[in-house]
């Protein structure tokens, strides 16, 4: 019976159609979503250079990229590509333009920005500059990252492959609150990043503590910012 229910759930949710890419107020939502995705990449690049922690997904991808010897952009396409297949099978209705934008753009934006920061000397300021200045930059970057992440999510043009998986798991495991599943999933991503970092001669990339704190705090902040945005979008 359990297997039968699982299969029913699987085939019920695997309803993909290209029409789902064209959402109401498409132009308006796209105008919010696409710049938000690009800015997420910009802010993640700053967080990476400061080295005090990023969002759990970026922490995982950054350390996997370091082990594989690839850029973050290529690694994110590979990792999210695997997650995309899982999402397509078990939650195809969550796929949209935002899914593809998140999967294909953010990592390459991070790589480009880090190259720019390195060439103009901003990278040195972020990693070795005045401590108080770095705290201010980190705080503002975290706030603005949360805002643009909220804009991206509330545009409702598709769910990122990373974000789709806890949604799918929540549909399977209804006895556990979604917030708990999401936090556990984020912590698992941090764990994968740590394991990958242990395999890297250069060690773990980024702060474990910072990434764990962000996994606990980002959700509530994004929810808070998202409430007024829903009136606009």
Language-model-detected regions and their locations in the chain:
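Core subunits and conserved enzymes of cellular information-processing
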Residues: 9-11, 15-233
